[in-house]
């Protein structure tokens, strides 16, 4: 399946496949689009389609939502037949001998992605700069949604946010919600564990500044790596290459450039163009690019926001993005997503990441058979892992190793089952997890980093974690009684009943 170049090709491909519906009646961007999308995304699979709202009140831009909101649509957007193909491609890429330590392997992983020659292609003439607004750019021109009744404002929810390490120039592309404060400023909700926040911390260290709530007159935007200016340039791309949109959402290792990774996914380099008012590059095929800067000394109260947990995340202080320019296509499509109680569109983006990273986890933990992060666990609350158990404490070893692996450190509950268990069958997992554990022996309780959005944590970003060893116990575990044999019908009788099934009249 060929890679898609931009959002327009995705719309055309989805419409051709019968997986997109155009809504031609007027709709409000205040709550109405959310309710429509929520019903569609949680409805029967045949009615769960991408939506293109052509007449959004207060704007002449059509709004695209739920484009990635099902496994088949996301696979189409990424140029694969199924999401499992992502993992298969990574497994082939990693079918080489890597060095021994965890840190060395992650560094080598970045090199492997570079070796596929998927680096960005620089262009000077870009669709995202058909219209350039630098005199009086205004966020009011965008049909930004208010999604839920108690949201603190309107939010941009599907951005690719480009930042740079001020020392090395290393790029990061992340996806963070952006609250519209006014026509020229946004709340930059990059959480403390994310790449954008790390670049902000590095900017503080590099410039010797400390954050505070209120900023003075906006300073000049830094010109590049090594520049002593006290702010960091930021570019925000809306739309563009679907592979890059996905890559921005994925928790990639620091050594992997999201733009290169997207190029590897799509089989050719992503086209990038120099921004007009800041020294960063943006994807040439984007619909809209917001150029500006974040002053690490400035904070403003951001939120609340109806989040993917199904609850409102609390209002907290976050950095502020200042707009210096808007560049866009002549007739742009505004892409957005709705987050809320799962399953929503973001669940499928997370599912793609799960499938993609299984072979990477196996590279470091060869005993892992499969992983499932079900919708009910909203990514970080529940991770189910099947393993080839070989020695006492093996399940605990896997739990602690996973908690030490990048953003998996935020996982609240890890359930480990035996290799023959289908981790995607929640009924089977629950049956085995409740039947195979002795709470005194098989539960591991500890404390560690938690997701910013975890409202039940002991304190913000830190709390308890639970590991459950739901594997069968036997001689390896020195149990006091014999482990019972599982009830299974004989193959002979199963084959007999299969042959005679029509005879029974059932």
Language-model region placement:
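Intrinsic disorder/low-complexity segments
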Residues: 207-228
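Extended, highly charged
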Residues: 1-208, 227-506
